[in-house]
Amino acid sequence: MNIRKALPEDSEELQRLQAKCPQGKSLIVSTVNLPDFFSRARAYKSPRVFVACEEDQIIGSAACAIREAVVGARVLRVGYEFQYFTSPDYRRRGVARRLRHKIESHLTDQRAALSYALIMEGNLPSMRLFEREGFRLHRELVMPAIAVFREVEVPRAENIRPIAPRDLEAVAELLNQTWHGHELFEPTSAASLAHQIERIPTLDYSNLLVLEDESRILACVGLWDWSRIMRIAVLKLNLRMRILGRLLVLARILPRFPSPGDTLRQMMLTMIGYKSPAHLAPLVKYVNNLALREGIEQVFCICERGDKILESMKGFTRVDTAVNLYVKPLEPSVSIADGPVCMTGFDM
C-alpha cells in the first residue's frame, strides 16, 4: 500500500470511490464533493488531501488543513482532519490508520501544535481509530438543523443587507468580540475576511448578511450552500428515523420528511457574530425565508450545547445532532483549555 498526495487528475476516481462509502447510522447518505473532489478542501488556506493506493487503484483518502487558532490563550498553528473514507473492499486492513499517520507526519512537519477532528454521534469506527491514535474526546458539541418549510415574519427586515467591502473592518471586529476567549477561534481582520471570500467556493459578498442600526453592525452571518459543495443523497433510514418522520408528518410539524432517493439541500451558517442573541434572531429568520425561496431544506451550524446562538433559533422546528470534538496535542507543552470552543461551520 502506498500513501501519497492526491493529484488533480485523481478527482473523478475519488468522487466515484466517495459515492461507494455511505455515511451515517440513522440517516444513511451517500456524499460526493462538487463540482470536483477538491472543492471541499478549498475552504482552507493550507489544505492537503492524501490517497491510499493499492497498485494503481485508489482505495482510501483523508484530508487535513492548517490554520491559526487560539489554544490555551495562545494563537498557534493547528491541524484539522476531515473526510476519511476507505473502499468497502479494503475495510479492516489498516488503510485509515496509514492515512492518519501520514497526516500527522505532515502536520508535524508544518509545525502544527495540535490536531482536532469532528466525529458524528454513532460513528464508532472513527471514534475508535482516533482514540487509538492518541486523540481524546474534548467536548460533545451540537449541530442544530432548522427545518425550512414555511416563511416566517422577519422583524427589522429593512435593516438586513449583504455586506460590502467597506463593512469588513466592522465585521472582523464583531467576530473577534463575539468569540473572544473561545478555544479554536481564529482571530480575524478585514484583510483575512476578504481573502476568505475570494478563496472559499460559493462564498461571496451576496451571501454574507448583516443587521445594522444607524450604520452600526449588530450581527452578521455567512451562508455556505452545501448543495453546491457536496451532493448528499439519502440511501436509507433506520426504523427509529422512519417512525420519527411519520410522526412529524402526521402531526403536521413538517410537511414531508427525507426518504430514500432524495437529494438533500442544506446550508451551513458560518461567520456568526452578534452583539446580542436578540440581534442574531432576525438574521436567522431572514435566512430561513431566503433558503425557502432557493429550495434549501435545512439550515444548520455547529456550536456548544447551551450556546447563545441557540436562542436565535427559538420558534423553529429543529433537530439536534451530537458532534464529538476530538483533540490531540502534537507538542508536549500544548493543552487545549476547558473553556468554550468556536466552530466556524467550515469544519464539517
Outline where the language-model segments fall.
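Short, high-confidence coil segments that cap the C-terminus of an alpha-helix
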Residues: 47, 110-112, 206, 293-297
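Hydrophobic adenine-recognition pocket in adenosine-nucleotide-binding enzymes
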Residues: 6, 84-86, 163, 272
